[in-house]
Structure formats: structure tokens, C-alpha cells
Amino acid sequence: MLIENTNDRFGIVIDAGSSGSRIHVFKWQDTESLLHATNQDSQSILQSVPHIHQEKDWTFKLNPGLSSFEKKPQDAYKSHIKPLLDFAKNIIPESHWSSCPVFIQATAGMRLLPQDIQSSILDGLCQGLKHPAEFLVEDCSAQIQVIDGETEGLYGWLGLNYLYGHFNDYNPEVSDHFTFGFMDMGGASTQIAFAPHDSGEIARHRDDIATIFLRSVNGDLQKWDVFVSTWLGFGANQARRRYLAQLINTLPENTNDYENDDFSTRNLNDPCMPRGSSTDFEFKDTIFHIAGSGNYEQCTKSIYPLLLKNMPCDDEPCLFNGVHAPRIDFANDKFIGTSEYWYTANDVFKLGGEYNFDKFSKSLREFCNSNWTQILANSDKGVYNSIPENFLKDACFKGNWVLNILHEGFDMPRIDVDAENVNDRPLFQSVEKVEERELSWTLGRILLYASGSILAGNDDFMVGIAPSERRTKLTGKKFIPGKLLESDQLRKQSSSLSNKGFLMWFAIICCIFYLIFHRSHIIRRRFSGLYNITKDFKTGIRRRLKFLRRSDPFSRLEEGELGTDVDGFKDVYRMKSSSMFDLGKSSATMQREHEPQRTASQSANLAPSNLRPAFSMADFSKFKDSRLYD
């Protein structure tokens, strides 16, 4: 248990991923107390976002993932989330529990579940957190939710640049603030988020750029324009599956007009696996035997079509799979990659950190062209950090996929980190930790909350994330507030407006009743027809009020009495919380996760000016002759 400090503030973020849920406990100082600091570092503190602290042992993971409760959503809180919160109770002083917000942010696995199952699980978590209400839960729809890939990418960008101190010593009068671009490659998707250095590119692509608002301790507003995009199906594992399916689908018997010979070839050669290695792959209920042929050049060329560079874009420059983005100025826009960018480079090739194309491609070539027995012998010697054999079999493909994404997908130049035009930072570097702290998007979420809790400064702008205009139009995506109580303020404002409206209508109704009851003789003479209508209306109201006094079934519904009929309608009304209604937008939001396959009608809607062929031999002219690498 921590030594209690009344100025401490705590926050909890649970990353509910596909394989498991990991809780993160964070701490920062009350910003009001920092305003009165008088030490020599006070000026720097005031011009920075709150300092978020996390000890190494303030995280804990529980397997399997939240999505595993799809058959028993009612058990998700007690069996999965409560043990994580019990872990947090051993860190956070009890006096701080009620003021400690909990964010349960579900990602990969939950995104794949049907909407009704998502809602059932999340609604059960909301009820579990509120009864009993040990931690701060203001709004379930904002705190317990499935987040899309873009939101996850923006949180990752926030967490990355916070760890590098790019939100500290902020001068609002300076327009040029450096930040790192964020690249993340998981098993299912890949993401990019960066603040373009070129203001002209921001202006040209304004409708594609999100805006992040932070607040320094002294109240100064920090405004960051960030482009973000995510590609579902372009993660390392899903790309591998698409690649093997491509090998099968290109067989002659699978492309002719005869169905009786489909899948007659069950043995295939894979240039992206080391020679002598083998594996089985199931495709359309058929098992295929894959044998490695170990050819680096052929592997690189075979992978290139998976980027779908031929997909039409509605604007330029075009990245891949029909996604356009602001032009990346690699002379000034520098990037950091995590997850697969780090694991592949570091665990297999010992080349994590600053990226060097020549060194990485040479090591990858040697590995891909090696015999499987030699790779196993190296593994026994500890060369590959004790990576399991099935991971080693995929390492050649994953290394090539990383190269293709970086240089063909994002058009990153193939230059060394010590080249003259790289300035003082490398074009790209892969990391797992920054200053001994794990790089996690959860840090970005709690930073947004802590920054939004600052009371100093102008209230004209709320701390949070404003989605791009395009996302708002296409999916209805809304502003993500940093501070939970913003919703309370909005409700208060709405309530205030409602009260004013109620008073106005009440005054009008009083005037009407005065005319009806006190000047009815005038009304009858001049507006006898209108009077009769009014009289009938009053009679109907009296009858309705009499009925309502006798029975109010809908009020009983609100109280939870669902066992009785409601005017003969049985089992028609299904009770849902506000969070369940809000979650209906998540499926639309996922459309931004650019799936690798798109229907013809969708492609036609993009109205491209220039269509590129899928690929031709000209596409391979960029690959150097293998003799140049030997």
C-alpha cells in the first residue's frame, strides 16, 4: 500500500485485447497544488502537461481476453475485471478509490464480436463497476467501450510523445513543435499516426486530420493536428494468412472454369520459409502442406501484391489499399515503430533501435536463404532469444512484410541512419520501452484525462480529440472528451436550457388556460368552433389523466417491473443502458480500418482519376539484383 498523499491523483486503464486484459495503474499530482509551487523547476512544470507516474509493477495481465465471455457475458465482470481491480486496490490508497476513474478500452478481439454481444458484455461490466461503486464511473459509454483502430493509434501517438517529453515546456506562441510519428503493427492490423511538419499539407488535407487538444498545468492550450489511419488485415499474422491464401488461389486448377479439380494440389513451395522447413495451412476446410524454399528475392516480390497498391485513391498521395494521406516529409517527419517492428528486428536479427536498411535487409537475406537445420542449430545456441520454432518459420515473411510496409507502403527512403540528410534523428527506429517505461497506448488515454482535469485556463476549448471531418461525416464519430465531468457540464447546460424552455412554455400554457376559463364567454361568441375543439380536448385530457391515475404501466417499466403486460404487448420492450445505444456507432467507425478487400461498388465510389494495374514486371524494377548484396 502506498503512503497516502492528499495531492495524489490516480487513474486506471484496462487494455482489453484479444489474448487478455492488462490493467495499468497511473498516478499524477493534483494540478491545483502545482500552481502554487515555488521551486526552481516550477516554471517548466507549469508549461508542461501533468507528469504521469507508473511503477514497473503497476501492471497485471489476465488471460484469456474479454471476448472469450461471448457465451457468458454476465460472468465477464466477476471473473475477469474484478480480479484486475483487486490488484489495483493493493496499489491505490482506499481514500482515493472513489476519485479514481476506470477506463476499460476493448480492442482487437471485441471488435470482431457481433454488436449485441459486445453490448451485453460491456453493459454487464458497467453494472458490476457501479454496484458497488468503489471507483469513479461517471459515464459508462465513455469509460467502458470498444475503441476503433484510429482512436488506439491516436492514444499511441499521445503516449509515445509524452514519454519523449514533447508536450513539456510548451510555448503556445511557437507554431513549430517537433513530435515523433507513431507506427504500430500488431497481428491483425497496422497503424500510423503523425503530425505533418508541413503546414501546407495540413491545409490541403484538413478534412482528413484529427485535432488533439491538451492543456498545460498553467492552463495554456496545446493544439496538435494529427493524421491517423489503420489497416485491418495488414498486421503481420493476417498478412501471412493472406499470403498463403494467395499461393493457393494462383494455382492453375483453382483459376479455370472446372470445379472438380479445385485444390487438387495440396503441396506448395513457399519462398518466405527457410529451406527444409514445413508447416500445414488450412484453407476452405482443406489442409495444405507448405514446404519452405528459402528465396529472399522471390519472397519480397511475392509479398508486394499484398499491399494492394493498385487500389484506387480519391486523392494523392496514395499509400496502399486505397488510402491517401498528407505527404510525409521524411527530412522532418521522423517515426518510431512498436510491436512487430520491434520484435522482428530485435528478437531475430538483434537490430532493434535505430533502423539501417542495408544492415536489416542483409541480415534478413541471410536468414531467408539459410537452411532450416542451421537456423535450429543457431536457436539452440540462443541466437534468436529462445523464440519458438513456429515463430522462426514466419520470421522471413514478417521481416519482408516490415520492409514492404515501410518502403513500398509508406514510401520511406532506403538510406542509412548516418546519412547526411537525416539531420539529428534517424528516419525510423523501433522501440519497446522509452526511458525504461513500456510504450503503451493506455498512457495516452490517461494523459488525456489528467490534462482535461486542469481547471486553469480558458474554457473555450475542451481537452480531447476532435475527429477528422471525413470521419464525422462518414461514421458519425464524435468528440472524445478528456475529462469525464465534461458530460456533466453538458448535461447541466442542457438542463439549464430545458428549465428556461419549460418556464416559457409554462407561461404560455397559463395564458391559454386564463383565456379559456376566465374569458370563455368572449371565446364562445367569437370562436365558438375553436371553443368546442378546446372543450373536447379538455375532456380527453381529464379522461386520460383518470386512466393514468388508475394504471401507469410504462412507469412500472422504468422501475424494472417487467413481469406484467403493457396494454397487451409482451416481451416487446428490451431495456438497454445509454452505453448500449452509443456502442451502436462502433461498427461504422471500424470502416476506417481499411480492409484488404473491397467490393466493386465501393471502389467505384472513389471515382479515381488514374487506375494502376495490380502489378507488373515494371513493379519489380525497384528490387536490386541479388549480386549487389553479396
Curated annotation (Swiss-Prot):
It is an enzyme of class 3 (hydrolase). It is a single-pass membrane protein. GO terms for cellular component: Golgi apparatus; Golgi membrane; membrane. It is found in: Golgi apparatus; Membrane. Disulfide bonds: none annotated. The lineage of its organism: Eukaryota, Fungi, Dikarya, Ascomycota, Saccharomycotina. Its cofactor is Ca(2+); Mg(2+); Mn(2+). A divalent cation Ca(2+), Mg(2+) or Mn(2+). It comes from Saccharomyces cerevisiae (strain ATCC 204508 / S288c) (Baker's yeast). Keywords: ATP-binding, Golgi apparatus, Hydrolase, Lipid metabolism, Membrane, Nucleotide-binding, Sphingolipid metabolism, Transmembrane, Transmembrane helix. Activity is inhibited both by interaction with VMA13 and by V-ATPase acidification of the lumen. The activity of VMA13 is not required for YND1 inhibition. Catalyzes the hydrolysis of phosphoanhydride bonds of nucleoside tri- and di-phosphates. Has equal high activity toward ADP/ATP, GDP/GTP, and UDP/UTP and approximately 50% less toward CDP/CTP and thiamine pyrophosphate. Has no activity toward GMP. Required for Golgi glycosylation and cell wall integrity. Together with CDC55, required for adenovirus E4orf4 (early region 4 open reading frame 4) induced toxicity, the apyrase activity is not required for this function. Plays a role in sphingolipid synthesis. It comes from the Eukaryota. Present with 450 molecules/cell in log phase SD medium. Residues 1-500 are lumenal. Interacts with activator subunit VMA13 of vacuolar H(+)-ATPase. Interacts with CDC55; this interaction is disrupted by adenovirus E4orf4, which remains associated with both YND1 and CDC55. It catalyses: a ribonucleoside 5'-triphosphate + 2 H2O = a ribonucleoside 5'-phosphate + 2 phosphate + 2 H(+). This is Golgi apyrase. Changing residue 152 to Q: Expressed at lower levels. GTPase activity reduced. Pathway: Protein modification; protein glycosylation. Residues 518-630 are cytoplasmic. The active site is at residue 152. Residues 586-606 are annotated as: Disordered. Disruption phenotype: Cells are partially resistant to E4orf4 and can partially suppress the spindle checkpoint defect in CDC55 deletion mutant. Does not suppress the rapamycin-resistance of CDC55 deletion mutant. YND1 and CDC55 double mutant is fully resistant to E4orf4. Deletion mutant suppresses the synthetic lethality of triple mutants, where UPC2 and ECM22 are knocked out along with either HAP1, ERG6 or ERG28. GO terms for molecular function: apyrase activity; ATP binding; GDP phosphatase activity; nucleoside diphosphate phosphatase activity; ribonucleoside triphosphate phosphatase activity; UDP phosphatase activity. The chain crosses the membrane at residues 501-517.
